[in-house]
């Protein structure tokens, strides 16, 4: 280890230094608690609609806001549904609700509502489903509402409807506002459940591993201290607008922090226990232990930090907004790992291990146990071990090619949530395209003259769009009457500035299906041709498409680009760091390839379970990216710990023996750390969103595969074939590999 790190280890492990470190962390909590709020206060949810402002759908929305300004914000879709046809009495109740939503007594945050009660009966009849069991009322809320305000407003609507006693009719609220309200409901107590489940699980596992109350509690105290500091720093960031504090990122960050810090505790404690058996001074023992593990911890934590920083290169906000939260967290996790953990355990000393207090032993303990046997197997039969594992992992990886992805947020909600039930009722009772119509904007650089020639061109354009595959209807109907002076134009048809025409089209397919996305893609690709063939000058006029389907097409495009960028950059940066740490390109390349294979096998095996056992038709498109970032970044930790120990043992033993001893000496602590990490991510299985459930399950499988099969057996069996000429010198490994 280099001189500055040795000096730092010596200071932290000294009686005075350990006390200074502990006091500094406690003071940091005190000061931050006084001046900074909790991160939860300023946390926001970017959601699936969080796309870059330069995307076509965002440009369309900007034009829409400029040309057709509105006070309306998020839309709530009130779905009234009965098992039998809606009666006249039911219709009267719905009319009363509509009248209330248009009156002065309506909730203050309701901006406007569809005036069902004012419509002629013939028009009302057209609003019902074919079997007359379902009707939909649109309610627009005030712009700029927070999620809590949306929840309260919809709650007022539900309570009013409940008081009116609508009999056998069932009310479900879906749409953007309904989704926002349900998100609040789903995660109302989720953070507390997540935290206590994580703490409880780690506590139980640590008690089983160490059978020592202090060794079970101290790591949690350390994680709690660091978490409090990180929470307040992120709160400051949110308060001052330094960056977006993403809600979902906070939940996963908490798990990451507790799991990684507990892992660092295990790594340091394993070496500390070894040294306590060699020397009487608890401070000297910690100094030697910390000197041995500080560099691996810095490199392993550094690789995780680099992976998180790489997310800044992502354009899609759902990924980009994870970067600052996790980067800040990793900085303090690293600081806690190399300062707070050794300082606190140095002060507690041997008492931390009670009732199994390590004593100074005259002889070195003989290696034994499960991982010693694994090390022996790897040393004696490396080819067979590596071959069997490679075949297993490659076979599991093949399933990756058959994975199907969903861009429908509703599919991630539990079946019993109101927004999902409302959406599915609409799916069953109305044409699919009506669920989320597409807004078509004809933008002109000059003022539009609504004369006969223009109307004829517009009619031609409307008909051309209607003839395209995948398009069901285009409204309003373009007739010659629109050019008549003082004619009653459809609402929001021509903008006030007369620079835009607004049309609405419905698709033949579900707006979230791949076929619908392909239709929008075709429309975009053929926009100029459509304009030209209809007689419009494509230099003056342009077509823009807005709405959920157009937005999801952009999400798909951004996701594909960001997947390539993040996968490439993370792989390159981590490979460079591994090469620098191991001082060997071959070893670094081997570690990188095995981690990538582990990731592919995890996804493939996960898809088998999700699709063939759990019955999912598709999974969230974000799952592969999230899994890659965390699985690769966290998997590096164990590889670095293993290779560092092998290199250390290679100073005293022949290379094959050094590999076997490295497996034996690190197997117990790394497998324990892996179990804790897998278990903490497994807590996400309790979360209500399907995306978090599948992410937690995937990470749990991936960590266990990486810990026991890849790191525990595959990597060592491959390393056996690397034969340094000067195996007794660490510095010889990178240059002398043959």
Which positions does each model-derived feature cover?
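Acidic/histidine-rich, surface-exposed loop or edge segments in extracytoplasmic proteins
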Residues: 76-81
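Short, contiguous strand/loop micro-motifs
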Residues: 47-48, 85, 318-321, 361-362, ...
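Structured non-transmembrane domains adjacent to transmembrane bundles in polytopic membrane proteins
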Residues: 54-72, 83-177, 402-618, 640
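Residue-level detector of family-conserved "landmark" positions at structurally sensitive sites
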Residues: 22, 74-75, 355, 388, ...
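N-terminal cofactor/phosphate-binding cores enriched in small/glycine residues
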Residues: 27-28, 38-39, 46, 50-55, ...
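Membrane-embedded transmembrane helical bundles of large multi-pass transporters/channels
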Residues: 1-44, 142-403, 536-540, 548-738
């Amino acid at each position: 280890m280099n001189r500055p790190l040795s000096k730092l280890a010596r200071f932290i492990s000294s009686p005075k230094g350990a006390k200074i470190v502990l006091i500094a962390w406690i003071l940091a909590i005190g000061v931050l608690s006084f001046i900074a709020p909790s991160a939860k206060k300023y946390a926001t949810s970017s959601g699936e609609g969080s796309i870059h402002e330069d995307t076509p759908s965002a440009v369309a929305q900007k034009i829409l806001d400029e040309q057709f300004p509105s006070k309306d914000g998020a839309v709530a879709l009130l779905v009234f549904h009965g098992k039998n046809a809606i009666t006249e009495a039911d219709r009267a109740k719905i009319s009363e609700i509509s009248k209330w939503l248009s009156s002065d007594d309506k909730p203050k945050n309701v901006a406007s509502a569809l005036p069902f009660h004012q419509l002629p009966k013939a028009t009302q009849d057209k609003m019902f489903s074919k079997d007359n069991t379902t009707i939909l009322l649109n309610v627009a809320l005030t712009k700029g509402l927070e999620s809590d305000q949306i929840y309260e407003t919809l709650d007022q609507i539900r309570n009013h409807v409940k008081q009116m006693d609508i009999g056998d009719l069932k009310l479900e609220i879906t749409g953007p506002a309904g989704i926002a309200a349900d998100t609040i409901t789903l995660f109302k107590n989720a953070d507390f459940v997540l935290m206590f489940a994580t703490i409880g699980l780690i506590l139980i596992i640590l008690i089983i591993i160490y059978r020592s109350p202090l060794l079970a509690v101290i790591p949690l105290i350390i994680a709690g201290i660091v978490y409090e500091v990180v929470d307040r720093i992120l709160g400051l960031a949110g308060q001052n607008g330094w960056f977006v504090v993403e809600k979902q990122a906070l939940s996963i960050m908490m798990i990451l922090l507790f799991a990684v810090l507990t892992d660092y505790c295990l790594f340091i404690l394993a070496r500390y226990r070894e040294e306590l058996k060699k020397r009487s001074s608890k401070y000297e023992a910690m100094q030697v232990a910390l000197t041995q593990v500080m560099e691996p911890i810095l490199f392993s934590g550094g690789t995780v930090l680099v992976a998180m920083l790489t997310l800044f290169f992502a354009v899609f906000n759902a990924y980009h907004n994870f970067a600052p939260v996790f980067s800040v967290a990793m900085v303090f996790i690293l600081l806690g790992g190399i300062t707070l953990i050794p300082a606190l355990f140095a002060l507690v000393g041997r008492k931390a291990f009670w009732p199994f207090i390590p004593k100074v032993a005259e002889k070195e303990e003989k290696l034994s146990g499960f991982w010693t046997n694994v090390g022996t197997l790897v040393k004696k039969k490396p080819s067979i071990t590596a071959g069997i594992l490679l075949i297993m992992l490659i076979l599991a990886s093949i399933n990756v090619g058959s994975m199907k992805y969903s861009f429908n947020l509703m599919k991630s909600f539990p079946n019993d949530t109101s927004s999902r039930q409302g959406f599915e009722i609409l799916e069953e009772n109305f044409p699919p395209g009506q669920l989320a119509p597409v807004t078509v904007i004809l933008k002109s650089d000059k003022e539009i003259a609504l004369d006969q020639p223009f109307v004829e061109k517009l009619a031609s354009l409307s008909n051309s769009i209607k003839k395209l595959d995948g398009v069901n209807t285009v409204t309003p109907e373009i007739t010659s009457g629109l050019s008549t002076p003082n004619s009653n134009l459809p609402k929001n048809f021509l903008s006030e500035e007369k620079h835009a025409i607004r049309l609405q089209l419905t698709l033949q397919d579900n707006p979230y299906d791949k076929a619908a996305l392909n239709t929008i893609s075709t429309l975009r690709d053929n926009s100029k041709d459509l304009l030209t063939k209809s007689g419009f000058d494509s230099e003056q006029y342009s077509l823009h498409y807005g709405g959920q389907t157009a937005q999801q097409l952009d999400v798909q495009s951004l996701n594909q680009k960001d997947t390539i960028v993040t996968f490439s950059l993370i792989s390159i940066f981590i490979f460079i760091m591994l090469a620098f740490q191991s001082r060997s390109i071959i070893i670094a390349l081997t570690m990188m390839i095995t981690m990538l294979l582990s990731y592919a096998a995890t996804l493939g095996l996960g898809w088998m379970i999700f699709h063939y056992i759990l019955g999912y038709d598709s999974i969230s498109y974000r799952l592969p990216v999230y899994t890659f970032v965390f699985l690769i970044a966290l998997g590096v930790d164990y590889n670095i710990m293993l290779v560092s120990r092998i290199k250390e043992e290679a100073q005293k033993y022949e290379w094959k023996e050094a590999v076997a001893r490295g497996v034996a000496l690190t197997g117990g602590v790394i497998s324990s750390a892996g179990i804790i990490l897998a278990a903490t991510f497994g807590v996400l299985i309790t979360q209500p969103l399907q995306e978090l459930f599948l992410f937690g399950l995937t990470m749990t499988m991936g960590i266990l595969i990486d810990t026991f099969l890849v790191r525990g057996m595959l990597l060592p069996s491959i390393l056996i074939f690397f034969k340094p000429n000067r195996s007794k010198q660490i510095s010889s490994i990178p240059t002398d590999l043959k």
